[in-house]
Amino acid sequence: RSGTITVHLIYRPPYRFPELLAFFRDRALAHVELVDDVSYTRTVRLEDRDGNVACGRVRVEDDSAGNQLVVTMSDELVPAVSVAISQALSPLDEAVRGVHIDGVRVPGCFDTFEIACRAVIGQQISVRAANKLAGRIVERYGERIETGIEGLDRAWPRVTEVRSLASIEDAFGELGLIKTRSRAIDAMAAAIDEGELDLDIGA
């Protein structure tokens, strides 16, 4: 089992962390995310431009007394620590401008392709139904990741993995996804792979 490193990140209060956790708890993706009363934990797979891959997990919890977020990550992620921290905080640290409730953050996302696929899957169905479908996809096609935590063991399929499917309609259809949604995900993956669509944060 790998070790971990911990980083403390100061924020300007107030920070409504419990509300964010409640949002993510209702949408936690099986095998990828775990949310309890005090923390958000998920699998991580980072790949640099040279094709080097780092896999592990990231856990974020709030130290409200110290006005800081406590980020704990697998030591395999140390070479990409700045990217890991940035992406770990992305779902948790987008401040809302011009609102009347101090400390509110707009939930972001960790993996843009993952969240885009989940948005397609979730069209016109309930959050619960969308989570079940997404969970089946990641269980069948997601890369296995060792985290040392039961139930936290896969990453969302990469663009290349989706494109390698002989028939996405058949592959995802077996799991309950309708053809139009499968085709939409396939078209999105193709556009990303061919450089026509950039979902990177800040693009």
Describe each region flagged by the PLM.
Residues 1-203:
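HhH-family (HhH-GPD) DNA N-glycosylase catalytic core used in base-excision repair
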